[in-house]
Amino acid sequence: MSFSFLFLGNLPLAEGFGINTNIFETNIINLAAVVAIVISFVGKNLSALLEDRRKTIVNNLQEASQRAAEAQERLNIAKNQLEVAKKKATEIREEGVFRATQEINNCVAQHEERLSKLEEFKQETVQFYQQKAFKQAYVYIISRIMSRVKERLNKGLDATYHVVVNNFYVSRFTEYNP
């Protein structure tokens, strides 16, 4: 304060409040006045603005943390769903392999059954044609025998054949037991 009195004491009385030509002193005084005004008026507003900004940043961080926690929870749910889907896919694949194996076994069994029926049918067919061939051979042989017998009967029996026929009937009668 003593400085201000000295400063006022050095001023001539006649000069008053005129234009100060010392720019350096004027600028320092003006700067000090502006800084004092800014600090007194703007300081409270600036601290309020900074406090609001701090609260906004804290709220944003809390919201970001909450969203990160929600995202982590959704990620965990998605991972669980993926594991469930993988297990389900494995079960479906195993069931598919089981059913395919079962179907292959069924097809093989049906094929073997058809082959056995075909083999049985083949054997029956071969047996049928063998019997047919034997029957035809029997019919042919019997017809040939009958035709030769007819020829003999038509020609007549000579003494040797007459004796053979009589011996045949005699042997039949002796075998007969009433």
From Swiss-Prot:
It is a single-pass membrane protein. Keywords: ATP synthesis, CF(0), Chloroplast, Hydrogen ion transport, Ion transport, Membrane, Plastid, Thylakoid, Transmembrane, Transmembrane helix, Transport. One of its GO terms (molecular function) is proton-transporting ATP synthase activity, rotational mechanism. Disulfide bonds: none annotated. The keyword Ion transport applies. InterPro entries: ATP_synth_b/b'su_bac/chlpt. This is ATP synthase subunit b, chloroplastic. The gene is atpF.
